[in-house]
Regions:
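Conserved active-site and SAM-binding loop architecture
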Residues: 1-123
Length: 123
């Protein structure tokens, strides 16, 4: 499978897919923390490739409910809507297998409820 790991610079998830024999590419604005296939740049540059699976870890800075007290300012400066639009790049992608990791946030209201909720204490 061709797997894109978007907004991922640790290389951990990419390396797990590579170890299983998949073709995997991590992509982030930051350089990869480990050697391996990594595109340092805007994910939009590689999003149109024929991926079999996309796992995205978009920044939660402007989307999480823990920052609700700053939502008014984020609406006014546009960062809330920019974060939501970036999230939707993945949600609307035609790839059949898309997973988006994000904490509980405003996307449950703006987009839809998540298919799964996984808590860190479960692992």
């Amino acid at each position: 499978m061709r797997v894109l790991l978007a907004c991922e610079c640790s290389g951990a998830v990419r390396d797990a897919f590579l170890a299983l024999g998949h073709e995997a590419l991590s992509c982030d604005l930051q350089p990869s923390e480990t050697p391996g296939p990594h595109y340092q740049g805007d994910v939009r540059d590689v999003l149109a490739f024929p991926w079999d699976m996309i796992i995205a870890f978009p920044p939660c800075t402007d989307l999480t409910v823990s920052g609700a007290r700053w939502h008014k300012a984020k609406r006014e400066n546009g960062s809330l809507y920019a974060g939501a639009a970036f999230f939707m790049l993945f949600a609307n992608h035609p790839c059949q297998r898309v997973a988006i990791e994000n904490p509980v946030g405003i996307m449950s209201s703006l987009y839809r409820k998540p298919d799964q909720v996984i808590q860190p204490w479960q692992f």
